[in-house]
Amino acid sequence: MEVAAKLFGARLSAQKARLVADQVRGKRVEEALDILTFSPKKASSIIKKVLESAIANAEHNEGLDVDELKVATICVDEGPTMKRIKPRAKGRADRIFKRTCHITVKVAEE
């Protein structure tokens, strides 16, 4: 049985979040939490919160054993992009893209 947790509109790019997601995909939950705890990336703390939420959902909603869980799937999709303006010289302006992403973590028993 797979149990999911989702985060919509996380304030980091999907490209950077996928670097961290690839490290924990398919790992046991305890090992994945260790990897995320000691990773220096910004995405690791965000993905760790979503993973902890999925673990709590599995434990409380479905009654699954936490020691038997593994990260079944983890998906990072692009979210809406906020567009901002940065003034430049001689009346010009540059666009700034503030990217967001949607993170989905599914855990399942081994």
Curated annotation (Swiss-Prot):
Organism domain of life: Bacteria
GO molecular function: rRNA binding; structural constituent of ribosome
GO cellular component: cytosolic large ribosomal subunit
Entries under Pfam families matching the protein: Ribosomal_L22
SUPFAM superfamilies to which the protein is assigned, alphabetical: Ribosomal protein L22 (SSF54843)
InterPro entries per UniProt: Ribosomal_uL22 (IPR001063), Ribosomal_uL22_bac/chlpt-type (IPR005727), Ribosomal_uL22_bac/org-type (IPR047867), Ribosomal_uL22_CS (IPR018260), Ribosomal_uL22_sf (IPR036394)
Entry keyword set: Ribonucleoprotein, Ribosomal protein, RNA-binding, rRNA-binding
Coiled-coil region(s): none
GO biological process, alphabetically ordered: translation
Role played: This protein binds specifically to 23S rRNA; its binding is stimulated by other ribosomal proteins, e.g. L4, L17, and L20. It is important during the early stages of 50S assembly. It makes multiple contacts with different domains of the 23S rRNA in the assembled 50S subunit and ribosome. The globular domain of the protein is located near the polypeptide exit tunnel on the outside of the subunit, while an extended beta-hairpin is found that lines the wall of the exit tunnel in the center of the 70S ribosome.
Quaternary data: Part of the 50S ribosomal subunit.
Similarity comment: Belongs to the universal ribosomal protein uL22 family.
PANTHER family: CHLOROPLAST 50S RIBOSOMAL PROTEIN L22-RELATED (PTHR13501), LARGE RIBOSOMAL SUBUNIT PROTEIN UL22M (PTHR13501:SF8)
NCBIfam families found in the cross-reference section: rplV_bact
Name used for this protein in its record: Large ribosomal subunit protein uL22
Species of origin: Hahella chejuensis (strain KCTC 2396)
